[in-house]
Regions:
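Histidine-acidic metal/acid-base catalytic patches
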Residues: 2-62, 136, 194-216, 220-304
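Active-site acidic/histidine proton-transfer and metal-coordination neighborhood
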Residues: 9-18, 29-33, 91-92, 110-213
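Active-site-proximal loop/turn and secondary-structure-junction residues that shape catalytic pockets
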Residues: 45-47, 75, 102-105, 146-148, ...
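Catalytic domains of carbohydrate-active enzymes, especially glycoside hydrolases
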Residues: 56-74
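Glycine-rich, proline-tolerant flexible connector loops at the mouths of alpha/beta enzymes
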Residues: 70-90, 144-148, 188
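Mid-chain, structured segments of secreted extracytoplasmic proteins
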Residues: 83-115
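Catalytic-core regions built around general acid/base machinery
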Residues: 84-91, 166-170, 231, 262-266
Length: 304
């Protein structure tokens, strides 16, 4: 019995399923699914089924049919682990999604326009280029900080745009893309500068670079502004990446109010070839709950 068969046997036993290892692969619970879009799980999403080892988790994701992966914390992982994860992703056909290049949830770093804060931002962008090279990433996330209550929003926007223009000049020669993530004020992140999709669209147009795009987090934008498909349509030319989570709760699709089947149908119809990050929790914290996440994605992906 090889390692994967043993893992499957252990899972079935823990779920109370009396299934012979020789026939497990033919059962729907382990049948590799062909998804229509590139949904990207993250480390920890399937730890009860796959174990704590990130390599085992990546293998498990690929076994289920996922073709992408995202990891907010990739930049802080040991270089040796980054290299191992990159190798297994290439071997198993997992495309690397975002990691976080820059974030500040407490200070008006980019909006304030202070040179020290801008220099620190650009330093982190340069460091993220090296991470991206190691793990074959194209996209990474930028959260520009909070609003500056001492400046009018127009001045803040100019400050943010200038920082992003300088960052873009670093990224363009490498073909890398920072994706700006608007985050909601009403539930999770009150006071952040970037909060709405039209605002992010305006900033990307002002920066005017292929290396500066929008991370459209469907969970956050449902809370902040709603009107999801029309806003996606308006922002389409500046969207580089999507993230997923249902509302309320920020769990897997089908657990809240968002009609993900229709949203994914629209995204697919527009021939989106990018990644949709599964940046949400699981509604149930056990093996059965992790299987439920997989089944939820099969359900909302059935739009063809």
């Amino acid at each position: 019995m090889n390692r994967r068969t043993f893992t499957r046997a252990s899972i079935c036993a823990s779920l109370g399923l009396a299934v012979a290892p020789s026939v497990m692969a033919s059962q729907n619970i382990f049948k590799k699914h062909q998804f229509n879009l590139k949904y990207a799980p993250h480390i920890g999403m399937f730890k009860n089924l796959a174990g704590d080892d990130p390599i085992d988790q990546l293998n498990f994701m690929a076994d289920q049919g996922f073709t992408a992966f995202e990891d907010n914390n990739m930049g802080t992982r040991p270089i040796s682990l980054q290299e191992k994860m990159s190798a297994i992703m290439q071997k198993r056909g997992l495309e690397m999604g975002v990691f976080v290049a820059y974030k500040d949830f407490k200070n008006p770093t980019l909006a304030g326009g202070k040179e020290e804060a801008r220099s620190d931002f650009l330093k982190q962008i340069k460091a993220s280029v090296e991470v991206a090279k190691r793990v074959n990433a194209k996209w990474f996330t930028v959260v520009p900080g909070t609003v500056d209550l001492r400046l009018a929003e127009g001045y803040q926007t100019v400050n943010v745009v200038e920082s992003l223009k300088q960052a873009s000049s670093i990224l363009e020669p490498h073909g890398l893309v920072m994706v700006l993530e608007p985050l909601n004020w009403y539930r999770n992140h009150p006071g952040l500068f970037l909060r709405e999709s039209p605002q992010a669209f305006n900033i990307c147009r002002a920066v005017n670079s292929s290396s500066c795009k929008i991370l459209f987090d469907i969970y956050h934008q449902q809370i902040q502004e709603g009107n999801l498909i029309p806003n996606i349509e308006k922002c389409w030319d500046e969207i580089g990446y999507f993230q997923i989570g249902d509302n309320p709760g920020r769990k897997e699709p089908t657990t809240g109010e968002i009609n993900y089947n229709n949203i994914f149908k629209y995204i697919h119809k527009r021939n989106f070839n990018g990644i949709l990050g599964m940046e949400h929790g699981n509604s149930r914290p056990d093996k059965a709950g992790e299987l439920a996440v997989i089944e939820a994605y099969k359900s909302v992906d059935s739009f063809i």
